[in-house]
Amino acid sequence: MFFIIHSLVTSVFLTALGPQNRTMHFVTEFVLLGFHGQREMQSCFFSFILVLYLLTLLGNGAIVCAVKLDRRLHTPMYILLGNFAFLEIWYISSTVPNMLVNILSEIKTISFSGCFLQFYFFFSLGTTECFFLSVMAYDRYLAICRPLHYPSIMTGKFCIILVCVCWVGGFLCYPVPIVLISQLPFCGPNIIDHLVCDPGPLFALACISAPSTELICYTFNSMIIFGPFLSILGSYTLVIRAVLCIPSGAGRTKAFSTCGSHLMVVSLFYGTLMVMYVSPTSGNPAGMQKIITLVYTAMTPFLNPLIYSLRNKDMKDALKRVLGLTVSQN
């Protein structure tokens, strides 16, 4: 499904953002400055980001393989987790490869269409992540607060429907804001002092003020961030209340272990998002915005397998079984 959406959206956006549809735009490319500094410092930064990226692909890829190959993990909880890990691979890949190329390149340019395509996929994948975190919290709520009804509610069919809603819904949220921003006149300068194509720097480069477009983007960001966040908060309020009523200490520990890992992921992801996109960003220096962006574009996908998935005993056992199967076949 992701590849179908990717192909359709790419062709549509390349047509919509092509030169023939941008008669008012004098800028044909942007310059992404990224982290600029001494060459030795940039080399260290490149090595750090590259290792982080490869480990992220390895960790999340291992989770996807474990969920797919181990029948014991063919349950709603792990199907959601496998999709989440697959999402993280594409989320970090939407920005980090271009970031790595920019560090090594003397010419740090990105085309007008390429900039807005990166903008679209980065924000759409981030929105999909918000939706998945909300659905995963709902799944834990059903499992802990309504265990007797859980098998009849969270069926395989319903789980697949939720997965499809997350993917499709995430990619349908941002076309309107992105098209509105792309139609603004950009007559120069074209330097974006950021790691990625972000709405804040793009608004600053526009030749005219666009308060209505800024308001639409701010409203979209707030709704997409706070809607799923309030859903997660509600689910875990009920979960924590139910866990505290469990008489067995071992049962409480197991429930808190699973939910605690998910809450760590939610806190890390949503904390940086709210600082970046909900609070006014005009007061934040460019360096601080880059650090915050690096946290939720690279650090969060890297840490998710460690603090959420790989701490799970069933997942670790599945990874060992999959590794053993691979070794025996070779």
From Swiss-Prot:
Cytoplasmic side: 65-72, 139-157, 236-255, 311-330
Gene3D superfamilies for the chain: Rhodopsin 7-helix transmembrane proteins
Compartments where located: Cell membrane
InterPro entries the record matches: GPCR_Rhodpsn, GPCR_Rhodpsn_7TM, Olfact_rcpt, Olfactory_GPCR1
Main location: membrane
Disulfide bond residue pairs: C115-C207
Superkingdom field: Eukaryota
Residues the record marks as carrying a glycan: N21
Membrane topology, Extracellular segments: 1-43, 94-117, 179-215, 277-289
Molecular-function GO term, any one: G protein-coupled receptor activity
GO terms under cellular component: plasma membrane
Topology of this chain in the membrane: Multi-pass membrane protein
Keyword terms, alphabetized: Cell membrane, Disulfide bond, G-protein coupled receptor, Glycoprotein, Membrane, Olfaction, Receptor, Sensory transduction, Transducer, Transmembrane, Transmembrane helix
Transmembrane segments: 44-64, 73-93, 118-138, 158-178, 216-235, 256-276, 290-310
Pfam family, one: 7tm_4
Function: Odorant receptor.
Family: Belongs to the G-protein coupled receptor 1 family.
PANTHER family according to UniProt: G-PROTEIN COUPLED RECEPTOR, OLFACTORY RECEPTOR 11H6
Record's protein name: Olfactory receptor 11H6
Species in which this protein is naturally found: Homo sapiens
